UniProtKB/Swiss-Prot annotation:
Function comment: Involved in the first step of pre-mRNA splicing. Required for cell growth and cell cycle control. Plays a role in the levels of the U1, U4, U5 and U6 snRNAs and the maintenance of the U4/U6 snRNA complex. May provide the link between the 'nineteen complex' NTC spliceosome protein complex and the spliceosome through the U6 snRNA. Associates predominantly with U6 snRNAs in assembled active spliceosomes. Binds directly to the internal stem-loop (ISL) domain of the U6 snRNA and to the pre-mRNA intron near the 5' splice site during the activation and catalytic phases of the spliceosome cycle.
Family statement: Belongs to the RRM CWC2 family.
Sequence ranges assigned to domain RRM in this UniProt record: 141-218
Locations listed in the record: Nucleus
Chain intervals for the UniProt region annotation (Disordered): 1-27, 270-292
Assembly mode: Associated with the spliceosome.
InterPro entries hit by this protein: Cwc2/Slt11 (IPR039171), Cwc2_RRM (IPR034181), Nucleotide-bd_a/b_plait_sf (IPR012677), RBD_domain_sf (IPR035979), RRM_dom (IPR000504), Torus (IPR032297), Znf_CCCH (IPR000571)
Protein name: Pre-mRNA-splicing factor CWC2
Protein keywords: Cell cycle, Metal-binding, mRNA processing, mRNA splicing, Nucleus, RNA-binding, Spliceosome, Zinc, Zinc-finger
GO cellular component, one term: post-mRNA release spliceosomal complex
Amino acid sequence: MSSDNTVAPKRKLKPARKQVASDEVDKSQGYQAGREYNIWYNKWAGGDREDALASKVHSQTRCIISRDAGYTRADATGNKYCCLFFARGCCPYGYECQYLHRLPLPSHQLPDNSRDCFGREKHADYRDDMGGVGSFNRQNRTLYIGKIQESPDKKQMTETLLRHFGEWGKIVKYNILFGRGVAFVTYETDHQASFAKEAMANQSMDGDEILNVRWATEDPNPGEKVAEEKRIEEIGQKAIAGMLDENLVEATQAVRALEDGDVEDFYHIETSKPEEEEENRPAKKGKSEGGFFNADALDNIKFYAELAKKQAEEEKEKARKVPAKQVGMSLLGGYGSGDESD
């Protein structure tokens, strides 16, 4: 029996793909000019100086979200961090991995804000070359992209940049410096920027270049600074509002409306018919001056207080004007001269 209302089948989640085999990736490291490895800045220090950009090697693997993303053991265990090797396209575990194999969503919340989306600890300051994990003192959403192989057509270059970097998240702003091979890309969240930085490091777009992807320095434009501060303030307000109880928020708004005299803004109050007021009663309508009683209520209280005081004074005045009874004359009234017995 067929029914008209057909329900679309639910899309099954696919397991994460094993991007590489454990023996496919060349794990040999290049020549390190440094003598000591600085665990704080995650780089070598000391030794001979060399051009770090000239010694870069093209990455052997690359992540393709539509093909590699899927569920892993982290979806069952509740781990909120993404897999760093998945972003680089070289995770051999696939669905058996203990980390997430997907892009961080805009609503993605991490248990520790001092770590990036991969679980790596951030530092107080950026590295001198603006590489590495980043800083926890600033929410950076902008990436610096260097060594871009430019195209004669500017529109084609813009399309190529947005196609390759738009795969890792929503791009809210971008700027291409034509003639310099440099571009700046701003993502919606810092988690997306961190993921894109690792995914596109030492990669190439449509050419054979090796991209230099770093964190961007702070924008010196005053307008951008004000907009960023406003955005962070709005995010904080939404986060605080999400943790508050709705009944508590409504009660607070009601109390504030009573204090400000703007009750009509929250509750619809029907206009009542004007009542006949006493001749001596002042009819004043004033705005609230703070507190639980507005100007009208205070005038009413003052009026009734003065009225009660006036009535009390009138009672005292009446008590003073009443004459006292003559006791002597009332005693003599019993001895009348018209009595026959006398």
